[in-house]
Swiss-Prot record:
Gene that encodes the chain: HSP15.7
Top-rank lineage group of the source organism: Eukaryota
Subunit structure: May form oligomeric structures.
Claim: Transferase is one of the keywords in the record: no
Protein name, per record: 15.7 kDa heat shock protein, peroxisomal
Localization in the cell: Peroxisome
Native species: Arabidopsis thaliana (Mouse-ear cress)
UniProt entry keywords in alphabetical sequence: Peroxisome, Stress response
CDD domains, alphabetized: ACD_ScHsp26_like (cd06472)
Length: 137
């Protein structure tokens, strides 16, 4: 059977570690990259957005663990089982080179974190460099 990973995950720019699901959409406009991440139940204080070395957008969520109360009989504990006792996630996305990492904005509304990464539209010198070829003849 062929490796279906290429077809299921065509963008190898994504890294994910989670005890819960943090679904993500990545859209691109003429002037920015827009990321929308599902973070239901998280407050802005529970979420950390960082730009790491190498233009990597890091989004981490750490939910509050519920305390076990004495004198309670648990009949179903799906939220605990699927989240490992707390809701945590980490998503890393390798950003393109032409972005303004110092102007990234993020906000949470109705359980969705939106991160806007502006593009750098200024013309830059080419990273292509000619190399002289010599002969030993």
């Amino acid at each position: 059977m062929a490796d279906r990973g290429i077809f299921l995950y065509p963008f190898r720019r994504f890294q994910e570690w989670s005890r819960s699901t943090a679904l993500i959409d990545w859209m691109e406009s003429n002037n920015s990259h827009i990321f929308k991440i599902n973070v239901p139940g998280y407050n802005k204080e529970d979420i950390k957005v960082q730009i790491e070395e190498g233009n990597v957008l890091s989004i981490r969520g750490e939910g509050i663990k519920e305390e076990k109360k004495e004198n309670l009989v648990w009949h179903v504990a799906e939220r605990e089982a699927f989240s490992g006792g707390g809701s945590e996630f980490l998503r890393r996305i390798e950003l393109p080179e032409n972005v303004k990492v110092d102007q990234v904005k993020a906000y949470v509304e109705n359980g969705v974190l939106t991160v806007v990464v502006p593009k750098d539209t200024s013309s830059k010198s080419s990273k292509v460099r000619n190399v002289n070829i010599t002969s030993k003849l």
